[in-house]
Amino acid sequence: ILNVAVEGALWRLRGTDGKAPSMIGWWPAKAVTFVDNHDTGSTQHMWPFPSDRVMQGYAYILTHPRTPCIFYDHFFDWGPKEEIDRLVSVRTRHGIHNESKLQIIEADADLYLAEIDGKVIVKLGPRYDVGNLIPGGFEGAAHGNDYAVWEKI
């Protein structure tokens, strides 16, 4: 779902019940998430994540409840190691875990915005103006191509 969502269908990241879709919404404590792996992704070309949106994928999986996995090739070969490190640091600093509370604030074609444990807010998508959706008391922690993460100060 995530690999389709980042290509202009970010509304897919909110199910009809308001939670994250599929297993990640039903039972996040047991869900393991990844952007690509050696069987499906960039090396096999079976169903690769859009290469220009890989960091949006990591911004999502590393800030959301569940158990995220980082693909070796992305971390060591592709070059976004520092961006991934920043996102891992946010996750660690705020104690995000597989049972953290997720509140999806907005999910449209060009904007996904969610708050995790009341401590972290993540934005995906090309929409720059998020209006009043980011409450006071948050500051930027990480950002890149079509994603941003804020943390409570």
UniProtKB/Swiss-Prot annotation:
Gene Ontology terms describing biological process: polysaccharide catabolic process
Site (Transition state stabilizer) location in chain: 39
Cofactor(s) this protein requires: Ca(2+)
Presence of the UniProt keyword Magnesium in the record: no
Reaction catalysis annotation: Endohydrolysis of (1->4)-alpha-D-glucosidic linkages in polysaccharides containing three or more (1->4)-alpha-linked D-glucose units
Note accompanying the cofactor annotation: Binds 3 Ca(2+) ions per subunit.
Domain of life (superkingdom): Eukaryota
Residues bound to substrate: 19, 25-27, 38, 44, 123, 150
Keywords: Calcium, Carbohydrate metabolism, Germination, Glycosidase, Hydrolase
Pfam families: Alpha-amyl_C2
EC numbers for this chain: 3.2.1.1
Family annotation (InterPro entries): A-amylase_bs_C, Glyco_hydro_b, Glycoside_hydrolase_SF
Molecular function GO terms recorded: alpha-amylase activity; calcium ion binding
PANTHER family: ALPHA-AMYLASE (PTHR43447)
More details: There are at least 4 types of alpha-amylase in barley.
Subunit relationships: Monomer.
Family of this protein: Belongs to the glycosyl hydrolase 13 family.
UniProt protein name: Alpha-amylase type B isozyme
Organism: Hordeum vulgare
